[in-house]
Curated annotation (Swiss-Prot):
Residues 58-68 are lumenal. Residues 1-26 are annotated as: Disordered. It holds the Pfam family VMA21. It comes from Drosophila erecta. One of its GO terms (cellular component) is endoplasmic reticulum membrane. Required for the assembly of the V0 complex of the vacuolar ATPase (V-ATPase) in the endoplasmic reticulum. It is a multi-pass membrane protein. Belongs to the VMA21 family. The keyword Transmembrane applies. It comes from the Eukaryota. This is Vacuolar ATPase assembly integral membrane protein VMA21 homolog. Residues 1-36, 90-105 are cytoplasmic. It is found in: Endoplasmic reticulum membrane; Endoplasmic reticulum-Golgi intermediate compartment membrane; Cytoplasmic vesicle, COPII-coated vesicle membrane.
Length: 105
């Protein structure tokens, strides 16, 4: 009878649920940070690559026409985009092998 009263009063029954919820929240936050980082990388890396190649590398050091500079910068941006996507896919496929999700009832 006393064990029923302890469970009904919420004695120790709430602590495991709370730590489990904090664990899930921590995993969700970690996943959010990872996805946000790769989204920013996928958006900003090609743009930065285009303008760095165009403004600082190709215009300054090579004597080629503006159209060829733009084409070379665009190719560099596409390569940077593919590298960022490849890193994201690699991380998604091979990244978190240590923490397997286990079902608890």
């Amino acid at each position: 009878m006393s064990t029923k009263n302890k469970k009904a009063a919420g004695g120790n029954g709430g602590a495991p649920k709370q730590t489990r919820q904090q664990s899930h929240d921590s995993q969700d936050y970690s996943s959010f940070k990872t996805v946000l980082f790769y989204c920013m990388l996928i958006v900003f890396l090609p743009v930065l690559t285009f303008f760095v190649l165009k403004g600082f590398v190709l215009d300054q050091f090579l004597d080629i026409s503006e159209v060829k500079v733009n084409i070379a910068s665009a190719v560099g941006a596409v390569v940077a985009l593919h590298i960022a996507l490849g890193l994201y896919i690699y991380r998604a496929y091979f990244g978190t092998t240590g923490s397997k999700a286990s079902k608890t009832d």
